[in-house]
Amino acid sequence: MNELILLSFSHIFIVFICIASIIFIPKFFKHSSAATHSSLAYFIISLILINQGMDLYREGYLDEWKLGLPLHLCDFSSFSILIYLLTKKRDFFIFAFFFGIAGAGMSILTPDTGYGFPAVAYIQNQIGHTAIILGVTYAMVIDNQRPYLKDVARA
């Protein structure tokens, strides 16, 4: 396995792919049909669920449970955006927006893994955190959700 080097070509390339996905996937689907929007939402939901399942398996079965505890804010943001995509309730978008973007963005740039690409933990980290921000971007671009200053107190 390769040690994680933040300025390595592979890490910068993966970060570029993550950021491009976050920006361009919702823009590409913006003017599509409602059925296509729904399919994209279910794709994001699937990414989040598979990532959380892999995380549970890796930390709960292969490693020790205590390595997965306490739950990180990104775990709550994952489930928040997942619930938003299923129900379209604004409160879940607000939580994912204010607590998900900063944490997930930092984790994409500086992952909490000892190894870089192609380690499974690294790939899982990048996909999971990209899915959080992709879900928030979906809500903003396709569902026209917007955070307002008054929403800070609600988060």
How would you name each of these model-derived features?
Residues I45-L56, G100-D112:
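Aromatic-anchored segments of alpha-helical transmembrane domains
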Residues P26-S39, L86-F92, I142-A153:
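Membrane-interface helix-boundary motifs at transmembrane edges
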Residues I44, F95-A104, D151-A155:
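Central hydrophobic cores of alpha-helical transmembrane segments
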Residues T36-A41, L69, F93-I101, Y122-Q126:
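Cytoplasmic-side transmembrane-helix entry/capping segments in multi-pass membrane proteins
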Residues M1-I19:
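Hydrophobic transmembrane alpha-helical segments in integral membrane proteins
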Residues Y57-W65, T87-R90, P111-I123:
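Membrane-interface helix caps and helix-loop-helix hairpins in membrane proteins
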Residues A20-I25, I81, A131-L149:
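Alpha-helical transmembrane segments in multipass membrane proteins, preferentially the mid-helix core
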Residues F9-V15, L62-C74, I94-F97:
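Structural signature of hydrophobic alpha-helical transmembrane segments
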